[in-house]
Regions:
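Glycine-rich Rossmann-fold phosphate-binding loop(s) that bind the pyrophosphate
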Residues: 9-12, 128-129, 149-154
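Glycine/Thr-rich phosphate-binding loops of Rossmann-like dinucleotide-binding domains
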Residues: 113-114, 156-157, 180
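Beta1-alpha1 glycine-rich phosphate/pyrophosphate-binding loop at the start
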Residues: 2-74, 159-181
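Flexible, active-site-proximal loop/turn residues at the rims of small-molecule/cofactor binding pockets
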Residues: 36, 109, 152
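FAD-binding core/adjacent interface of flavoenzyme oxidoreductases
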Residues: 1-5, 61-147
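Glycine/alanine-rich phosphate-binding loops at beta-alpha junctions
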Residues: 38, 82, 156
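Hydrophobic residues in beta-strands of the RecA-like P-loop NTPase core, especially within AAA+ ATPase
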Residues: 148-149, 172
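Internal, well-ordered alpha-helical segments in soluble enzyme and binding-protein domains
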Residues: 132-135, 154-158
Length: 181
Protein backbone atom coordinates (compact mmCIF):
# COMPACT_ATOMS: atom_id res chain seq x y z
CA UNK A 1 0.00 0.00 0.00
CA UNK A 2 1.33 3.43 -0.86
CA UNK A 3 0.24 7.05 -0.86
CA UNK A 4 0.65 9.78 1.71
CA UNK A 5 -0.72 9.57 5.24
CA UNK A 6 -0.71 12.70 7.35
CA UNK A 7 -0.99 12.28 11.12
CA UNK A 8 -2.03 15.32 13.15
CA UNK A 9 -0.99 15.07 16.80
CA UNK A 10 2.04 14.78 19.02
CA UNK A 11 1.09 12.29 21.69
CA UNK A 12 1.13 8.55 22.25
CA UNK A 13 -1.65 7.87 19.72
CA UNK A 14 0.17 9.73 16.93
CA UNK A 15 3.53 8.08 17.57
CA UNK A 16 1.92 4.66 17.95
CA UNK A 17 -0.08 5.12 14.74
CA UNK A 18 3.12 5.82 12.81
CA UNK A 19 4.65 2.64 14.25
CA UNK A 20 1.54 0.58 13.47
CA UNK A 21 1.59 1.75 9.86
CA UNK A 22 5.21 0.72 9.40
CA UNK A 23 4.70 -2.55 11.32
CA UNK A 24 1.79 -3.38 8.99
CA UNK A 25 4.05 -2.89 5.97
CA UNK A 26 2.78 0.49 4.83
CA UNK A 27 5.48 1.83 2.50
CA UNK A 28 4.01 5.20 1.55
CA UNK A 29 4.88 8.59 2.95
CA UNK A 30 4.06 9.17 6.62
CA UNK A 31 4.13 12.79 7.79
CA UNK A 32 3.39 13.62 11.42
CA UNK A 33 2.53 17.20 12.47
CA UNK A 34 3.14 17.84 16.19
CA UNK A 35 2.09 21.29 17.41
CA UNK A 36 4.52 21.18 20.32
CA UNK A 37 8.27 21.57 19.79
CA UNK A 38 8.89 17.94 20.86
CA UNK A 39 8.78 14.52 19.30
CA UNK A 40 5.58 12.62 20.21
CA UNK A 41 5.56 11.80 23.91
CA UNK A 42 3.40 10.08 26.50
CA UNK A 43 1.25 12.42 28.57
CA UNK A 44 0.28 10.22 31.57
CA UNK A 45 3.66 10.72 33.33
CA UNK A 46 3.12 14.50 33.21
CA UNK A 47 0.97 14.21 36.34
CA UNK A 48 3.06 11.47 37.95
CA UNK A 49 6.76 10.65 37.58
CA UNK A 50 7.69 13.60 35.37
CA UNK A 51 5.87 16.09 37.61
CA UNK A 52 7.57 14.58 40.66
CA UNK A 53 10.98 14.91 38.97
CA UNK A 54 11.47 11.14 38.88
CA UNK A 55 11.46 10.92 35.05
CA UNK A 56 13.25 13.06 32.51
CA UNK A 57 11.87 14.38 29.23
CA UNK A 58 13.59 11.70 27.12
CA UNK A 59 11.83 8.95 29.08
CA UNK A 60 8.48 10.36 27.91
CA UNK A 61 9.20 9.90 24.19
CA UNK A 62 7.08 7.39 22.30
CA UNK A 63 10.13 6.66 20.10
CA UNK A 64 13.62 8.17 20.05
CA UNK A 65 14.48 10.51 17.17
CA UNK A 66 16.48 7.74 15.50
CA UNK A 67 13.36 5.56 15.21
CA UNK A 68 11.56 8.12 13.04
CA UNK A 69 14.59 8.43 10.74
CA UNK A 70 15.08 4.65 10.53
CA UNK A 71 11.39 4.13 9.73
CA UNK A 72 11.11 6.99 7.23
CA UNK A 73 8.53 8.93 9.25
CA UNK A 74 8.77 12.67 8.72
CA UNK A 75 8.04 14.46 11.99
CA UNK A 76 7.37 18.18 11.89
CA UNK A 77 7.56 19.54 15.42
CA UNK A 78 6.15 22.97 16.19
CA UNK A 79 3.76 22.44 13.28
CA UNK A 80 0.21 23.49 14.15
CA UNK A 81 -2.30 22.33 11.54
CA UNK A 82 -4.60 25.31 11.04
CA UNK A 83 -6.87 24.01 8.33
CA UNK A 84 -8.07 20.69 6.99
CA UNK A 85 -9.84 20.55 3.65
CA UNK A 86 -11.30 17.06 3.37
CA UNK A 87 -12.72 17.72 -0.10
CA UNK A 88 -9.35 18.81 -1.52
CA UNK A 89 -7.45 16.29 0.66
CA UNK A 90 -5.11 18.95 2.03
CA UNK A 91 -3.88 20.23 5.38
CA UNK A 92 -2.41 23.65 6.02
CA UNK A 93 0.28 24.22 8.64
CA UNK A 94 2.43 27.31 8.99
CA UNK A 95 0.77 28.78 5.90
CA UNK A 96 1.88 25.86 3.71
CA UNK A 97 -0.69 23.52 2.20
CA UNK A 98 0.14 19.88 1.51
CA UNK A 99 -1.86 16.95 0.13
CA UNK A 100 -2.82 13.70 1.82
CA UNK A 101 -4.38 10.45 0.69
CA UNK A 102 -5.38 9.49 4.22
CA UNK A 103 -5.61 11.65 7.34
CA UNK A 104 -5.41 10.56 10.97
CA UNK A 105 -6.33 13.09 13.63
CA UNK A 106 -4.79 12.12 16.98
CA UNK A 107 -4.77 15.44 18.82
CA UNK A 108 -6.25 14.31 22.13
CA UNK A 109 -8.21 16.65 24.37
CA UNK A 110 -7.57 20.07 25.85
CA UNK A 111 -8.23 21.00 29.47
CA UNK A 112 -11.43 22.88 30.18
CA UNK A 113 -10.58 26.44 31.12
CA UNK A 114 -12.49 27.93 34.02
CA UNK A 115 -13.13 31.65 33.41
CA UNK A 116 -13.58 32.43 37.11
CA UNK A 117 -10.19 30.91 37.92
CA UNK A 118 -8.50 32.53 34.93
CA UNK A 119 -9.88 35.95 35.89
CA UNK A 120 -9.22 35.62 39.63
CA UNK A 121 -5.73 37.10 39.50
CA UNK A 122 -4.35 34.03 41.26
CA UNK A 123 -1.71 32.00 39.45
CA UNK A 124 -3.60 29.26 37.59
CA UNK A 125 -2.02 26.32 35.78
CA UNK A 126 -3.58 23.74 33.49
CA UNK A 127 -1.94 20.39 32.75
CA UNK A 128 -1.74 19.27 29.12
CA UNK A 129 1.85 19.71 27.94
CA UNK A 130 5.37 19.08 29.14
CA UNK A 131 5.78 22.83 29.66
CA UNK A 132 2.61 22.89 31.80
CA UNK A 133 4.07 20.15 34.00
CA UNK A 134 7.37 22.06 34.24
CA UNK A 135 5.52 25.21 35.39
CA UNK A 136 3.54 23.28 38.00
CA UNK A 137 6.67 21.51 39.26
CA UNK A 138 8.44 24.87 39.70
CA UNK A 139 5.59 26.00 41.98
CA UNK A 140 5.76 22.92 44.21
CA UNK A 141 7.80 23.52 47.34
CA UNK A 142 7.56 22.88 51.07
CA UNK A 143 5.03 25.19 52.66
CA UNK A 144 3.46 26.36 49.38
CA UNK A 145 -0.34 26.27 49.39
CA UNK A 146 -1.81 24.62 46.31
CA UNK A 147 -5.47 24.22 45.37
CA UNK A 148 -6.26 21.50 42.84
CA UNK A 149 -9.57 21.87 41.02
CA UNK A 150 -10.90 18.42 40.25
CA UNK A 151 -10.87 15.13 42.12
CA UNK A 152 -10.36 12.85 39.13
CA UNK A 153 -7.25 10.81 38.40
CA UNK A 154 -5.20 13.74 37.09
CA UNK A 155 -6.17 16.08 39.90
CA UNK A 156 -5.35 13.51 42.56
CA UNK A 157 -2.04 12.62 40.90
CA UNK A 158 -1.07 16.30 40.85
CA UNK A 159 -2.16 16.61 44.49
CA UNK A 160 -0.01 13.59 45.43
CA UNK A 161 3.03 15.03 43.64
CA UNK A 162 2.48 18.38 45.39
CA UNK A 163 2.25 16.69 48.80
CA UNK A 164 5.40 14.68 48.07
CA UNK A 165 7.14 18.00 47.33
CA UNK A 166 5.99 19.29 50.73
CA UNK A 167 3.24 21.61 49.56
CA UNK A 168 -0.02 22.00 51.47
CA UNK A 169 -2.78 20.78 49.16
CA UNK A 170 -6.53 21.31 49.03
CA UNK A 171 -8.51 19.35 46.43
CA UNK A 172 -11.78 20.96 45.33
CA UNK A 173 -14.30 18.62 43.72
CA UNK A 174 -17.87 19.41 42.64
CA UNK A 175 -19.09 15.86 43.34
CA UNK A 176 -19.58 14.35 46.79
CA UNK A 177 -16.44 12.20 46.56
CA UNK A 178 -13.34 12.10 44.40
CA UNK A 179 -13.09 9.66 41.48
CA UNK A 180 -16.85 9.40 40.95
CA UNK A 181 -16.71 10.21 37.21
Amino acid sequence: MSGRIVIVGGGLAAGSAAAALRDAGYDGDVVLHAAEPHLPYERPPLSKGYLAGEKDADSLLVHPASWYAENDVEVRTGSQVERIDVDAHTVTAGGATEPFDRLLIATGASPRHLPAADESGAPVAYLRTREDSDRIRSALAPGRRIAVLGGGFLGLEVAAAARTAGAEVTVLESLDLPLLR
